[in-house]
Amino acid sequence: MLDKNAEKLVEVRARTVEILDDLTISQKLALQALEKCDSKSFEQVKVPLKTINKKANDIDNLILTVCALYSPEAKDLREMIAFLKITSALQRIATNEKNYMKNMGICNPESNEEVKRVIKESLAINRCTIKALEYTIEMITETEDKDRIKDLEAKISVEYSKTDDIYSMIEKDLLQLMHEDHQVNDVYINLMKYIRKNLKIIDRLEDIASRLIFARIGGTL
């Protein structure tokens, strides 16, 4: 039978995975909507995000209660503190996703074909983000196999690196188009800004992975 510390830590992990599941569903809905440039579907993307702040706050309150009542040992305490940071990052990711979909209002049936093409190319970033979310879920649920945990962190880093490369190619493409047109195109400038902001999501996931490594294996942040 699990002691109270272990029992509550299992609950913290499970609740955190629930939030990550919501974020993953939202990302997949966003991907489907943007693949079709179907702005009518954008509102559906926000539905899984509506309860994330409450869920994150509930996790924080649970952690603080455990720390106050049960005096967890150093290893458990380290993981509890890591999850306080993780829930904060997850709330920011939810905000990033909402803002991203608001910005992607430029993807609609009236958008010019060049904008639609660039947005569809940028969705490779979203696919990397979905993979990183799934790896993060696995990192949280894997509590014993340290090699597997390190491997999952490495996979998240690979996905992060891919998104950097994808953005660099998109930026180069749009700058080349403006050069050929001999003018600054505000739509392209904004599009680069929106796509760059979308990178913050996977950046936060990489930070979460680092915190999980610190909590489970140790080292420095």
Task: Report residues per predicted region.
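Cytosolic, long alpha-helical scaffolding segments
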Residues: M1-L221
